[in-house]
């Protein structure tokens, strides 16, 4: 979660240093090892923008969801396994429904944070002619005209409406069910050995 403590534009500059399509350090290293005629990655792309945004805002989801998993009563999953349910069915019918409020809250937090971010899109997206709502708002403001300010205000209101609609939908989805677990004693979360799936799940 170190990226949680680093300003987004600083991280964007770091990734730019690594994956710049012409002089990126990591790009040149991979190209030299594999004897490639051109750089393998282009940070000035939609994929590059999504990657950098993901690396910076996944800690929001990680902290929210991991904390909820620590507090979840493992006896529910144990009861499911004793009843003959497979691990996959236990996850689908017990773990995921219990985690849904935290997952929805984390998704909402990440969306709002990423959608309102300006630093990363301006550094990564702008050179590749990739516009986002925040970069367009700043572009309109820099026009300095009344029309530019009006367009910037319209986009800002649009972004706010989208965030509120998503908040309402998430509240509606979570509010349809009750997620209260009553337990008379403290519990310890189960530690699951992922084995060969550890690296894929981490990625």
Kindly give the residue locations of the regions a language model identified.
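Short amphipathic alpha-helical coupling elements at transmembrane boundaries
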Residues: 1, 28-35, 74-82, 93, ...
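Membrane-water interface segments at the C-terminal ends of transmembrane alpha-helices
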Residues: 1-70, 98-119, 123-125, 152-171, ...
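Glycine-rich helix-loop "coupling/hinge" segments at transmembrane-helix boundaries
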Residues: 20, 119-146
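Juxtamembrane helix-boundary/capping and inter-helix hinge elements in multi-pass membrane proteins
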Residues: 70-75, 85-88, 126-129, 142-149
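Loop-to-transmembrane helix entry/capping segments in MFS-fold secondary transporters
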Residues: 80, 149-152
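Glycine/proline-centered hinge or cleavage motifs at structural transition points of membrane proteins
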Residues: 83-85, 97
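Transmembrane alpha-helical segments of polytopic membrane transport and secretion proteins
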Residues: 171-203
């Amino acid at each position: 979660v170190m990226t949680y403590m680093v300003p987004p534009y600083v991280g964007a500059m770091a990734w730019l240093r690594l994956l710049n399509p012409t002089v990126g350090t990591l790009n040149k290293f991979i190209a030299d090892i594999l004897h490639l005629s051109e750089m393998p990655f282009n940070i000035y792309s939609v994929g590059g923008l999504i990657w950098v945004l993901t690396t910076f805002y996944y800690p929001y989801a990680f902290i929210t969801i991991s904390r909820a998993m620590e507090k979840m009563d493992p006896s529910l999953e144990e009861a499911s396994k004793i009843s003959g349910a497979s691990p996959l069915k236990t996850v689908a019918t017990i773990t995921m429904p219990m985690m849904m409020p935290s997952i929805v809250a984390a998704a909402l937090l990440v969306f709002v944070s990423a959608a309102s971010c300006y630093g990363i899109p301006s550094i990564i997206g702008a050179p590749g002619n990739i516009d986002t709502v925040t970069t367009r708002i700043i572009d309109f403001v820099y026009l300095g005209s009344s029309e530019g300010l009006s367009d910037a205000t319209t986009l800002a209101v649009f972004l706010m409406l989208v965030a509120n609609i998503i908040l309402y939908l998430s509240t509606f989805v979570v509010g349809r069910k009750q997620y209260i677990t009553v337990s008379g004693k403290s519990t310890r979360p189960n530690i699951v050995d992922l084995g060969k799936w550890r690296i894929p799940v981490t990625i």
